[in-house]
Curated annotation (Swiss-Prot):
InterPro entries documented for this protein: PSII_PsbZ, PSII_PsbZ_sf
Species name: Piper cenocladum
Compartments in which it is found: Plastid, Chloroplast thylakoid membrane
Pfam families on file: Ycf9
Main location: plastid
Subunit structure: PSII is composed of 1 copy each of membrane proteins PsbA, PsbB, PsbC, PsbD, PsbE, PsbF, PsbH, PsbI, PsbJ, PsbK, PsbL, PsbM, PsbT, PsbY, PsbZ, Psb30/Ycf12, at least 3 peripheral proteins of the oxygen-evolving complex and a large number of cofactors. It forms dimeric complexes.
Name of the protein this chain belongs to: Photosystem II reaction center protein Z
Gene3D superfamilies: Photosystem II PsbZ, reaction centre
Described function: May control the interaction of photosystem II (PSII) cores with the light-harvesting antenna, regulates electron flow through the 2 photosystem reaction centers. PSII is a light-driven water plastoquinone oxidoreductase, using light energy to abstract electrons from H(2)O, generating a proton gradient subsequently used for ATP formation.
High-level lineage: Eukaryota, Viridiplantae, Streptophyta, Embryophyta, Tracheophyta
One of the GO biological process terms: photosystem II stabilization
GO CC, one annotated term: photosystem II reaction center
Key word Ribonucleoprotein present: no
Family stated for the protein in its record: Belongs to the PsbZ family.
Length: 62
């Protein structure tokens, strides 16, 4: 169970870093938002899911 928790935390950190770098790049590029809107929403949905997963796994480990 600890390995699953560690992998989930790593995935959350990696997704956070990708979104922190990627979202401003999408907004700054010309015509970037309209063409990459689905990717940003998918990344945000993945991030929200990982936050809940880490919380659930943390409650099971503690």
């Amino acid at each position: 169970m600890t390995i699953a928790f560690q992998l989930a935390v790593f995935a959350l950190i990696a997704t956070s870093l990708i979104l922190v770098i990627g979202v401003p790049v999408v907004f700054a590029s010309p015509d970037g938002w309209s063409s990459n809107k689905n990717i940003v929403f998918s990344g945000t949905s993945l991030w929200i899911g990982l936050v809940f997963l880490v919380g659930i796994l943390n409650s099971l480990i503690s």
